[in-house]
């Protein structure tokens, strides 16, 4: 029984910390003059707390593992909700596909250029020609 209560405590603590970061992100989003989603700010805050070792990973790991395990299931209601707007999506199909393709190409090209620059810098450092 004690082990069961310990596991329940770990999950409750993990979800509470994640929830606190989300609501802290909502507060920060309200204060900022630019529109950044509160959930993104909450994840950024959680990342900063974990990276700075202010928040132990063990406190959020059980809840995060559970959410990641069932992530696909969490997208089902959103996907069903999109079906209600199929007429709008079909009318805007071409712009959606074009923007996705162009965005993908931009990301691929940017990633390739950054990787090449990093590889060139690394090669120069190995040769002793550091900038």
From Swiss-Prot:
Transmembrane segments: 4-24, 30-50, 63-83, 88-108
UniProt protein name: UPF0299 membrane protein ETA_12980
Family: Belongs to the UPF0299 family.
Alphabetical keyword list: Cell inner membrane, Cell membrane, Membrane, Transmembrane, Transmembrane helix
Location in the cell: Cell inner membrane
Entries under InterPro entries matching the protein: LrgA/CidA, Uncharacterised_UPF0299
Classification via PANTHER family: HOLIN-LIKE PROTEIN CIDA-RELATED, UPF0299 MEMBRANE PROTEIN YOHJ
KW Membrane (keyword) present: yes
HAMAP family per record: UPF0299
One matching Pfam family: LrgA
GO CC list: plasma membrane
Membrane topology qualifier: Multi-pass membrane protein
